[in-house]
Amino acid sequence: MGVTKKPDLTDPVLRAKLAKGMGHNYYGEPAWPNDLLYIFPVVIFGTIACNVGLAVMEPSMIGEPANPFATPLEILPEWYFFPVFQILRTVPNKLLGVLLMAAVPAGLLTVPFLENVNKFQNPFRRPVATTVFLIGTVVSIWLGIGAAMPIDQSLTLGLF
């Protein structure tokens, strides 16, 4: 637990700043609810106003109309579903593919229990969590790139 220095209210410079009302928060005033109930609506309404302004100034086209008689040869999902699509596409048994997809969050839930004795927040001092993150990132990128390729090149990414 850190040691915090309390403000010296007998300091004339500090008293002059406080008398001018510099800063919204005064010493001893809690941040919740005084500050946060003031700041949150301003940020939320500002974000909504910026989004509405951008949507009005730059309307994008919805796209070309769908033609039910001309289907594409291979239907691809959105880019963020590429790794999951690649798992389902390459695993021959669909039940095994669904179980592999369910194993990803189940495996991530076990990481804190594997490293529960380690109290450090530095990633270099938590080797299990860092290794799981790096391997998961590489595998997700590999599966995502492979999903956009034909099935015969998807596992090797066309390199071999």
Curated annotation (Swiss-Prot):
GO terms for cellular component: chloroplast thylakoid membrane; mitochondrion. It comes from Zygnema circumcarinatum (Green alga). Disulfide bonds: none annotated. The chain crosses the membrane at residues 36-56, 95-115, 131-151. This is Cytochrome b6-f complex subunit 4. It is a multi-pass membrane protein. Keywords: Chloroplast, Electron transport, Membrane, Photosynthesis, Plastid, Thylakoid, Transmembrane, Transmembrane helix, Transport. GO terms for molecular function: electron transporter, transferring electrons within cytochrome b6/f complex of photosystem II activity; electron transporter, transferring electrons within the cyclic electron transport pathway of photosynthesis activity; ubiquinol-cytochrome-c reductase activity. PANTHER family: CYTOCHROME B, CYTOCHROME B_B6 C-TERMINAL REGION PROFILE DOMAIN-CONTAINING PROTEIN.
